[in-house]
Amino acid sequence: MNPKSNPDTIFSAPIDKIGDFTFDERVAEVFPDMIQRSVPGYSNIISAIGMLAERFVKPHSNIYDLGCSLGAATLSMRRHIKQEGCQIIAVDNSPAMVERCKLHVNAYRSDTPVDVVEADIRNIEIENASVVVLNFTLQFLSPEDRYALLEKIYAGLRPGGILILSEKFVFEDEVSNELLIDLHHDFKRANGYSELEISQKRSAIENVMRPDSKKDHKERFAEIGFSSYDVWFQCFNFGSMFAIK
């Protein structure tokens, strides 16, 4: 159950000077439409995050949604949480996203409280966590900040706790990488995006989103100390991984 939005037409007209992509008011207004039409398997990932939370949430623990945007993962988890004494902490640094996220969260009644926080996820304390979600968020951090954040998450997770990490992937084999990029662009065309929109969005986002390979992610998980980790979902060059402490 994702929030409805206006259609995404941000890149539909020619832009003389394309700036870096930001999660501003314009993007927040069209975000549900944008992400459904841009990220293959997004609805499946959101649904399954709720299922994973149901398995891993412990009573009297914290659940973190870091880079929560409009709260789709938060709402999915909240629908599945039956344990007592739990709290979801949903964090985003975009004021426009946080404002709308609060509206979406408050539209549904639940026994599990949600604290929507406007903050930089790098500055958030992680403690007593049974579930932490980074849903297409880590890729927007500078590479040097990623390891530090994952270390902090690991330290704040309870034993047996889970990190759910959804990302766009790059592939070491050039032929495979290009094929999956092409298939992703086919997916966007099939969802009504024009060549101009695809090209301009790519130009806007390439400097702010720097994806890693699955190997990079697994090596980091191993170095930090996670006991089990793997890919649980992939569609083209997008997917989601779990890492268990």
From Swiss-Prot:
Catalytic activity: prephenate + S-adenosyl-L-methionine = carboxy-S-adenosyl-L-methionine + 3-phenylpyruvate + H2O
Gene Ontology BP, a term: tRNA wobble uridine modification
Residues bound to S-adenosyl-L-methionine: Y42, G67, C68, S69, D92, N93, D120, I121, N135, R202
InterPro entries: CmoA, Methyltransf_25, SAM-dependent_MTases_sf
Top-level taxonomic group: Bacteria
Pfam family, one: Methyltransf_25
Enzyme Commission number(s) from the entry: 2.1.3.-
Key word Acetylation present: no
GO function terms (MF aspect): carboxyl- or carbamoyltransferase activity; S-adenosyl-L-methionine binding
Keyword annotations of the record: S-adenosyl-L-methionine, Transferase
Family: Belongs to the class I-like SAM-binding methyltransferase superfamily. Cx-SAM synthase family.
Quaternary data: Homodimer.
Record NCBIfam families: carboxy-S-adenosyl-L-methionine synthase CmoA (TIGR00740), PRK15451.1 (NF011995)
Function: Catalyzes the conversion of S-adenosyl-L-methionine (SAM) to carboxy-S-adenosyl-L-methionine (Cx-SAM).
Protein's name according to its UniProt entry: Carboxy-S-adenosyl-L-methionine synthase
Species this chain originates from: Vibrio campbellii (strain ATCC BAA-1116)
This protein's encoding gene: cmoA
